Amino acid sequence: MEKEVWRFIDSGNCSPAFNMALDEALLEWHSEGKIPPTIRFYGWNPPTLSIGYFQKVEKEIDMEAVKKYGLGFVRRPTGGRGVLHDQELTYSVIVSELHPAMPQTVTEAYRVISQGILEGFRFLGLDAYFAVPKTEEEKADLKNPRSAVCFDAPSWYELVVEGRKVAGSAQTRQKGVILQHGSILLHLDEDMLFSLFKYPNERVKERLRQNFKNKAVAINELTDRNITINEAKEAFFRGFEKGLNVQLERYELTDDELFYVQQLAKNKYETDEWNFKR
């Protein structure tokens, strides 16, 4: 049987506003039937703190620290918590809710899409599996996250490699389309990450930091060899093809598409109204 062909875009390192605008545009174009399901890889220039759609900047984020480090800042159209995008491979998957391979529930769709990530880790020679919360306490933890830091708690079907969470993902559904995007960390600057959020006091900050160490890990902490961004791209490209049983076809945006995304970035994702609205 011939495999279904999905589109693949590697947009390289882009501005925070452009990155979010392109994800939104792909969702829109797919909902209008203009493009097939799409998988996109990207990076960030400058390194960026992205926050979840529902987060309150004033209450949770130390904007002075964001400025001090020269980081970009953007609010995502997806939920979840704060993510520092630096040395990582970021991916997004855009596919119709009605696609025959997509289960109806968010959790199950998350598992199906994340199968591509799981296979990618295996191509890198790492033992990856899905964590499912078993105890009532673990389930309660999911509903009441203890901190604004996204990698703090594995969520349903979170990917765990060698017992530690490696890939954080968020999902939204709009116009009948699923957008899931997430981060695959190669390296992580923990000091920087923990200085970007507000805490009731130093003790809480330290406790969260210790917890975090046991739960979150970057790929290059798990292996002796240094995995480059290009190696990661290759592994996860193959991983998505295998995990979703599709053939990925590389695609470059047209000038018109590029212009549309740039306008959306400027008029929405670069504005204070969007980024600081809550």
From Swiss-Prot:
Pfam entry (one): LplA-B_cat
Similarity comment: family membership: Belongs to the octanoyltransferase LipM family.
InterPro entries: aa-tRNA-synth_II/BPL/LPL, BPL_LPL_catalytic, LipM, Octanoyltrans_LipM/LipL
The keyword Ribosomal protein is assigned to this record: no
Gene3D superfamilies membership: Bira Bifunctional Protein, Domain 2 (3.30.930.10)
Additional note from the record: In the reaction, the free carboxyl group of octanoic acid is attached via an amide linkage to the epsilon-amino group of a specific lysine residue of lipoyl domains of lipoate-dependent enzymes. The reaction proceeds via an octanoyl-thioester enzyme intermediate.
Record pathway: Protein modification; protein lipoylation via endogenous pathway; protein N(6)-(lipoyl)lysine from octanoyl-[acyl-carrier-protein]
Organism expressing this protein natively: Anoxybacillus flavithermus (strain DSM 21510 / WK1)
Example of a GO biological process term: lipoate biosynthetic process
UniProt-recorded name of the protein: Octanoyltransferase LipM
Role, per record: Catalyzes the transfer of endogenously produced octanoic acid from octanoyl-acyl-carrier-protein onto the lipoyl domain of GcvH, an intermediate carrier during protein lipoylation.
CDD domains in alphabetical order: LplA (cd16443)
